[in-house]
Regions:
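Flexible, solvent-exposed loop/hinge segments and secondary-structure transition points
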Residues: 1-87, 92
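Buried, small/hydrophobic-residue-enriched core segments of structured protein domains
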Residues: 4, 68-70, 77-171
Length: 171
C-alpha cells in the first residue's frame, strides 16, 4: 500500500500540515472503544500485516502480539513519530486490524461454543477471492481446525488445506 487507501480527510490534513510547515512528533494509540454485541474481549490479529505496512516508516511502534486477547479501551498499538510520516496509513492500519480481529474473534467464539467438535473455515465461495486467504488465516488463529483454500493453507504453514471436500467424504 502506498497511502492512497486512506480517508480523504487524512490527505487533506496532510496537505494543510505541509502548507503550514507543521510536523509535530505525536503518539497515536489504537484502541477499540467497544466490541460488537457487548462482548468483553476480542482477539487481536492483523498486527503482522500492519507492522509490515509500517516497516519502512520512520516511526516507533509498540504493539500487542498477534493472537493476543484485548479488552475495550486497552491500547493494542502505539505509534510514535512525526505525524506526516504516518498520517495517510491510519485508515489501512485500522482496516487491517479491525477486519482480521473481527474474523478471529468470531471464530474463537464459535469454537468455544462447539466444544470438542471440529470447526472448519469453508467460506471462500461466498467472499471476494482476494480476501479468502486473509479471512481463513484469521479464522484459523481464532480456533478453526481447518481451512478450505490452498493459499490459506500455505499462509498457515500447511502444504495443503486440511478440509476434505464433500465428494471425498461420500466415497
Amino acid at each position: 500500500l502506498d497511502g492512497r487507501i486512506t480517508d480523504v480527510y487524512f490527505e487533506r490534513a496532510l496537505a494543510i500540515l505541509k502548507a503550514k510547515g507543521v510536523n509535530p512528533v505525536v503518539r497515536a494509540e489504537f484502541i477499540a472503544k467497544g466490541l460488537p454485541g457487548g462482548w468483553r474481549w476480542a482477539l487481536l490479529t492483523g498486527m503482522e500485516e500492519a507492522l509490515t505496512l509500517m516497516g519502512n516508516l520512520k516511526v516507533r511502534v509498540r504493539a500487542m502480539q498477534e493472537g493476543s486477547v484485548f479488552y475495550p479501551y486497552e491500547p493494542v498499538m502505539e505509534i510514535e513519530g512525526r505525524y506526516q510520516d504516518f498520517i495517510v496509513y491510519e485508515t489501512a492500519i485500522l482496516g487491517l486490524l479491525c477486519q482480521a480481529s473481527g474474523v478471529a474473534t468470531k471464530a474463537s467464539r464459535v469454537k468455544k461454543l462447539a466444544g470438542e467438535r471440529l470447526v472448519m473455515s469453508f467460506g471462500a465461495r461466498r467472499m471476494h477471492p482476494i480476501l479468502a486467504p486473509m479471512i481463513e488465516r484469521n479464522a484459523f488463529i481464532g480456533g478453526c481446525d481447518g481451512v478450505a483454500v490452498v493459499k490459506s493453507g500455505e499462509l498457515i504453514g500447511w502444504l495443503k488445506p486440511v478440509l476434505p471436500a464433500m465428494a471425498e467424504q461420500a466415497e
